Amino acid sequence: MAKKSKIAKAKRIEATVEKFANRRAELKAAGDYAALALLPRDASPTRIHRRDHLDGRPHAYMRKFGLSRLNFRQLAHEGKIPGVQKASW
């Protein structure tokens, strides 16, 4: 499990990105890069790092399911992810 502070930081960055999204789009469309540089650093969407929704693990993240490979495997074995079954050939 990730540190609680890292999970909280990721949520804070996501909120900041959402808060400044419209303003960033307007400034980029106008080409006002000086004003864009004055916005908070965390307002840029490139600062978002995807994390597992269950435990906050930052690595081995599967976008389609919003889980890390470890939690995906566990939930898939338990049959809790619809449409996912173990391969057999």
Swiss-Prot record:
Signal sequence coordinates: none
Protein name: Small ribosomal subunit protein uS14A
NCBIfam families in UniProt: PRK08881.1
Organism: Levilactobacillus brevis (strain ATCC 367 / BCRC 12310 / CIP 105137 / JCM 1170 / LMG 11437 / NCIMB 947 / NCTC 947)
Entry keyword annotation includes Signal: no
Subunit composition and interactions: Part of the 30S ribosomal subunit. Contacts proteins S3 and S10.
BP term (GO), one: translation
GO MF, any single term: rRNA binding
Summary of the function given for this chain in its UniProt record: Binds 16S rRNA, required for the assembly of 30S particles and may also be responsible for determining the conformation of the 16S rRNA at the A site.
Family named by the database record: Belongs to the universal ribosomal protein uS14 family.
Domain of life: Bacteria
Cellular component aspect of the GO annotation: cytoplasm; small ribosomal subunit
Keywords linked to the UniProt accession: Ribonucleoprotein, Ribosomal protein, RNA-binding, rRNA-binding
